[in-house]
Amino acid sequence: KLKEKISTKTRAILICNPSNPTGYLYSEKEIRALIEIAVEKDIFIIVDEVYREFIYTDESHYSVLKDESGSQHAIMIDSVSQRYSLGGARVGCMISKNKELMAMALKFAHLRLSPPTLALLASEAAIKAPPSYLKGVIQEYTQRKNVIIAALEKINGVAVSNPMGAFYCIVKLPVDSAEAFSKFLLTDFEDNGQTVMLAPAAGFYSSQELGKDQVRLAFVLESSKLKRAAEIIQKALEVYKNS
């Protein structure tokens, strides 16, 4: 099906591995298959691997740069934003073994403004963190994932995905419009002065017909706050259905 979508206007295949928002982890076999298509069609395959350490299964992350057969077609994107919780730093990189492509990228980079000095200094310090730091981070996110999934599964009518990686869940709600419910949470509902902000999932789909009853939830807060968020969502759903 992917091959059928590729036309003379297609320049690249772009994926995120693990995926935002689904948390899907592409296997080595799938990455190799995508590389094969990129080589056959003479296009690039661009893979955002910013979440590559955030894996919750026994499978390991397979980088697009590992396959030499696609070395002239593969581009890997990385950033300090997720790994070190530096979302505002806007410090990242693109890596490719295609020397001509990298030369063109460097020419373009000279025409753009550079990141703030403080962001660069913070990033330099962050990447020096020992392996034990990331190990602790992954353990914490694994616990958070398990906590929020368990809490949401207790809510009647709610279905939640179990992500293989990254730190997002796609949550199906018992509502016709997740966007309307998300707005309701922010404008018309509170529980003891608190509410929850959700991201409607419809915007992540290429088809307007999909994801209307889904939201993306990021488990980036400590477990106690995630439990509280699930409690608020449950109470809000009860009020929303009766309004």
Model-derived segments and spans:
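PLP-dependent class I/II
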Residues: K1-S243
